UniProtKB/Swiss-Prot annotation:
Pathway: Amino-acid biosynthesis; L-arginine biosynthesis; L-arginine from L-ornithine and carbamoyl phosphate: step 3/3
Family indicated by similarity: Belongs to the lyase 1 family. Argininosuccinate lyase subfamily.
SUPFAM superfamilies, per database record: L-aspartase-like
UniProt cross-references to Gene3D superfamilies, sorted A to Z: Fumarase/aspartase (C-terminal domain), Fumarase/aspartase (Central domain), Fumarase/aspartase (N-terminal domain)
Name of the protein in its database record: Argininosuccinate lyase
Keywords assigned by UniProt, alphabetized: Amino-acid biosynthesis, Arginine biosynthesis, Cytoplasm, Lyase
Gene: argH
CDD domains, alphabetized: Argininosuccinate_lyase
């Protein structure tokens, strides 16, 4: 039986019921719906709707239902209820009879689902923070293990300047720390309790909403009933945070896919995160990384979906908002598995130091050092840039590195070049000079790594 049947003289069509019912999606809110109902039973007891004995009976029945459904979610789906709220109420009535019909007094499914969803976001959000923390740890451990491996840094996917592999790892640590901070901020803003605001105008029962919020673990109650039941900002914000984080995951995956390619050969991925070809026996494909990259678009789609759903809704609640959960659930599931998989990939990754060093020594990645050398000799940088460009063209034509050009040939481009030029053209010199804060010199990378190890980031809200 629908919770709203009294107004209607005929049954809903089977097609409408299939179209309207949300239980196949929102069954995942069972724990939150029951927890919220337990808190609501206590709240309406305090304003005289229920006796203490009735409240005790409802609490017992709700806890029993929670135990039953936590191990058998199929029980929920098989009920054929309209939504998770209807399932809980119908189950409660089956257990305690007419007493179960009193629980919804003063409450609407509008404030009920808003409460359920925020409780779910808080719980799942905390789990995502922990997964982000584990990925951060995996990157730090990889940076520590391969801190001084030399590799080419790229711009436009062209070799640019040499960097340390540890520096590359710590670049992604910075990104994922920002993701942690963003999610923490979103969860703080979501830490307000909607329960007790009714359908849109507030509840007619003079309950203590501050106490009600505290009983559910919220920092405070919401302050405007119209906004409360209309609000899905927390869904939008979490999907946005997930999209940014997935973008970071996808960029890291793309880097690693390239590093793993035969053309680069910088790293070797562990067998447990790769797969083969059904036709080509030699293939070892980076499927884990490619799926991370692929799932990023899926998460973006859910963000656009909820933004588009909400963009023109009048106050207060509209049925359109039922579409909030499917995308959110998929976002959180996709984000979680990608974080776990990325950490697993990193844990088994091996760096081919000979190959990375060889690549860093090619592509004239020391050209900037020659320009800086000329600047130190008194030449304006723009002129030095031009001189070095000419020298590089000459070296390319002769298929030789800059450091292998004879001194006389280098001096043909600028008379201020002396024999000490070769000292600045080594890989070691290129790296050592990047000693300003945030640079890729070994002391700077070691200092940055030590800071990440000594000061663990907070992973709660």
């Amino acid at each position: 039986m629908a919770l709203w049947g009294g107004r209607f003289s005929q049954e809903s069509s089977a097609l409408f019921k299939l179209f309207n019912d949300s239980l196949p999606v929102d069954y995942r809110l069972i724990e939150q719906d029951i927890i919220g109902s337990i808190a609501w039973a206590s709240a309406i007891t305090q304003v005289g709707v229920l006796t203490t004995d009735e409240c005790t009976q409802l609490h017992a029945a709700l806890n029993e239902l929670l135990a039953e459904t936590s191990t058998n979610p199929e029980l929920i789906i098989a009920s054929g209820a309209e939504d998770i709220h209807s399932f809980v109420e119908q189950s409660l009535i089956a257990k305690v009879g007419d007493l179960g019909k009193k629980l919804h007094t003063g409450r609407s499914r509008n404030d009920q689902v808003a409460t359920d969803l925020k409780l779910w976001c808080k719980k799942e959000g905390q789990e995502l923070l922990e997964l982000l923390g584990k990925l951060r740890t995996a990157l730090i451990e990889l940076a520590e293990r391969e801190i001084d491996a030399v590799m080419p840094g790229y711009t436009h996917l062209q070799r640019a300047q040499p960097v340390l592999f540890g520096h590359w790892c710590l670049a992604y640590v910075e990104m994922f720390e920002r993701d942690i901070s963003r999610l923490q901020d979103a969860l703080k803003r979501a830490d307000t309790c909607p329960l007790g605001t009714g359908a849109l105008a507030g509840t007619a029962y003079p309950m203590d909403r501050v106490k009600l919020a505290q009983s559910l673990g919220f920092a405070s109650p919401t302050l405007n009933s119209l906004d409360t039941v209309s609000d899905r900002d927390h869904v939008v914000e979490i999907c946005s945070d997930a999209s940014i984080s997935m973008m970071h995951l996808s960029r890291m995956a793309e880097d690693l896919i390239f590093f793993n390619s035969g053309e680069a050969g910088f790293i070797e991925l562990d067998d447990e995160v790769t797969s083969g070809s059904s036709l080509m026996p030699q293939k070892k494909n980076p499927d884990a990384l490619e799926l991370i990259r692929g799932k990023t678009g899926r998460v973006y789609g859910s963000l656009i979906g909820i933004l588009t759903t909400m963009k023109a809704l009048p106050l207060a609640y509209n049925k359109d908002m039922q579409e909030d959960k499917e995308g959110l659930f998929d976002v959180m599931d996709s984000w979680a598995i990608c974080l776990e998989m990325a950490a697993l990939v990193l844990s088994g990754l091996q760096v081919n130091r000979e190959r990375t060093l060889s690549a860093a020594q090619q592509g004239y990645a020391n050209s900037t050092e020659l320009a800086d050398y000329l600047v130190a000799k008194g030449m304006p940088f723009r002129e030095a840039h031009h001189v070095v460009g000419e020298a590089v063209v000459n070296a390319i034509a002769k298929q030789t590195p800059l450091e292998d050009l004879p001194l006389e040939e280098l001096q043909s481009f600028s008379a201020i070049i002396e024999a000490d030029v070769y000292e600045c053209l080594t890989i070691e010199s290129c790296l050592a000079k990047r000693e300003a804060l945030g640079g890729t010199s070994l002391p700077q990378v070691k200092s940055a790594l030590a800071g990440k190890q000594v000061i663990p980031i907070a992973l709660s809200i």
